Amino acid sequence: MADITKKIGKARAVATKTERTETVGLTKLGSPTSYRFDKPGPDLLEAFPNRNPGRDYVVTFEHPEFTSLCPMTGQPDFATITVRYVPGEKCVESKSFKLYMCAFRNHGSFMESLTNKIADDLIEILAPRRLTVTGVFNVRGGTGITVRVEHIDSGLDSTRVRALRDLW
C-alpha cells in the first residue's frame, strides 16, 4: 500500500511540474478579469506550448456572442465567430481568447476587416500550420454576411498542405 502511495505522489509531482511549465507566462487564467471593450489587439492573447507539436490536430473555438460596431452608423453587428486551427508550437489560451473577442464590443470596424484582424492577430501569436476564421454575421438591413479567412503556413511542402486540408 505504501508503495502505491509513493507512486501516486510521484505521478502528481510530475503532473504538477508539467502544468507549471505549460502555464509559465499566462497571466489571465485564474486571475481577476478586467475587460477592455474597445481596443482589440494581439497583446490580449496568450499562448502556451503545444504538448503535441508532432501531431496535426484541429482546435476549434466558437464565440456565438460576438459584437462589434458598424464604423459608419455605430449600430451593433452581432455574429458567431468560429476559429479553427492546426497548432504549430503554440496553442491559444481560452480565457485570453474570450477577453480578446470581448474587446471588439465597442470597436468600430467593417465585418470583413475585423475577421481579417482576428486571423492576423492569431497568426502573429500562434504561427499555426493552418487557420480559418469564419464570421457569420446576423442579418442587418435585410442582408446577412459571412466572411471566411483562410491561412496555411507557406513554409509547408505540398504533401503536408494536402494533409492539413484533409483535416477539415
Identify what each model region corresponds to:
Residues A2-W168:
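N-terminal intrinsically disordered, cationic/polar leader segments
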